[in-house]
Amino acid sequence: MLTATPLTTTGKSLFSQHYLETRLPAQPEWLEDPQPALDAALALWRKAQLYGANWNEAQTEDEFVKPLLAALGWSYIPQAKNSRSGRINRPDYALFADEASKDAAYPFQGNDDAFYTRALAIAEAKYWGRPLSRKDSSGRDTWKTDNNPSHQMVSYLVGTRRPWGILTNGQVWRLYSRDVSSTASEYYEFDLAGLLGARGAESGERTEAFKRFWLFFRRAAFTPDSQGRSFVQRIHEGSASYAREISDKLKELVFDEVMPEIAAGFVAYRRQQMGLREETAESLAEIYHASLSLLYKLLFVLYAEARSLLPVDNPAYWEESLTFVARQVAERIDRGLSLSEATHATRQYDSLLALFSRIDQGDPSLGVPRYDGGLFNPATPANQFLARHKLSDRAVARAVDILVRDAGQPVDYGYISVRNLGSIYEGLLENVLVVDAKPLGSTADASSMLPGVAQTPGVLNVALVNDKGERKATGSFYTPDFIVEYIVGQALDPILAQRAERFAAAMDQIAVLRRKLAHTLDAGANRVLREQLARAERDALEAFLGIKVCDPAMGSGHFLVNAVDHLTDGIIQRMQAYHDSHPDTPWAWNPIQRLLERVRQEILNEMGRQGIAVDPARLDDTALLTRLVMKRCIYGVDLNPLAVELAKLSLWLHSFTVGAPLSFLDHHLRWGNSLVGADVRTVERAISQTESGQLGLFGGP
């Protein structure tokens, strides 16, 4: 059946899958008939099945892409020349609303701004079935060889200033946007070959599935309406609105229900199983930190499973996955069944800890690599607490169900960004636990302020309050995205421009030295040239990867996550621009590209040693570069140790690379005072040492 295989995918969250499934059919465009375009696509597909495997790029365009663009209603001008040298280093197609717009643009070829302003979008085509997220050396490219198509799209969107771009190899079609945090990694992807080639599909099923392609890639999807908004813009805004709605709901639910439920479960366990009848301020702080750490882990796993960063397609892992557990819990709740086999049963909690351990240590039988430390490091105080304590099945089930469902529908963690998730949890950082509605050390009756406390029958009530004893979930200091993006852009764009000049100078020197080496036979001269080449390669690497960004009050890492995206896209665009303007300098001479290849091979080798099969396509250049940027360029400090852990979580999720360890951020994101540089006790100890004749903290004796 057609529905047995996934036909549409949301690459990295350009649109919400939940929005596409539940709200797209309510759009007026859904009622339109795609059958004429589907008939044209099927006719083209029949020819592609016979000959497509041997098509080069030009043949793919002539035999499939151009006719399909026409069937989708597009008017287009192919391969508009760049004014600088006449070299084709602009996208294959400028796409226009109609023939009149196309005719109006023709006279401006060579004037990029005037020409592309008249286009609705751009498009880039590759040979039939070519990988879209990595370089290819098969020789089937007729021009623009040795390029990463997704990186080309970043460069093209920046260069043409168009808001939308289409990238295709005939089989797979991607829609990119310039108005996102990371153009390189966020796109809507549709497996057109999977749809057209599906066997046994009923006509109605195929038509409805094709509609999800047709609605997003046809000309009408990009034409502004009377309010100046296009269909794709509306869906993008609707998806973003969905993410905000879910974030706001989760923020309230986490504060009112999930955290109190978890914390109350730990307090109950301590009373019932460990005989600890009273809690101190210190022990409540320990419970709070451990509860928040557990929440972080649940969030990490839900996010990673939703994006297939953990092997949910492996049947053995799937049966152990948190997503599978959540579905079982939802079914029991919906059927009114008991959430626990016994009052004090902890099977669900034990399974969670086992899953966390597998993520930390790896498990080849489940296809899980060893991620080695970070959030799942068993040596941390929070994780040691979690190992010594347990939660009942009921508490785990309730907490998980609240996190994964909204009004009975699954929460789309595949779309919610780490910035949305950061906003949920940042509001928890300044709170403390209260038990039985009385803050520790206070006689004030806070019951009137605690309508949503977690109640453990016959035992206790638990809630969160701020330092004023107020129960307030929204007291975070979260900066809106548009402000963050503006500040980050203003800070980094001038630096990237300067570093691009340094990179270009180093690459020019690399090209000269490599050509000299190719013709130098003298051993001494060869050695000198290689030393010079090594220095030039270090300069090229440091030009971009030597940029240092530090947030001295990082909170949840909002600014740092945006800085990672801005740097990654900026480096991609500027490297692509250099190679476009230097066609005789191959990408294989680029030290950053060579570093990406080396990192990819190191991960694959390590996975081989662990007995884990990893598709190399999962380790695409964009993901690896994002990780390199985070590993080499990003630093942060915060006074709140919980904020440090939240920032690590945000950046781990944002740079999650299959098979790569999580511990690499530990030395870059630190707990401390960015103004003083040390806590009071350290200063007092240093002063004492100075007075006794020992070396002081800030200078010599």
Task: Label each PLM-derived region with a short phrase.
Residues 118-119, 160-164, 170-171, 631-632, ...:
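Short glycine-/polar-rich loops that comprise or flank the Walker A/P-loop
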Residues 1-55, 125-127, 171, 181, ...:
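Preference for the N-terminal adenyl/adenosyl cofactor-binding alpha/beta module
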Residues 76, 85, 93, 99-107, ...:
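Carboxylate/His-rich catalytic cores and anion/metal-binding grooves
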Residues 66-67, 147-166, 535, 614-620, ...:
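Metal-dependent nuclease catalytic cores in nucleic-acid-processing enzymes
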Residues 624-626, 630-635, 665-684:
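P-loop NTPase motor core
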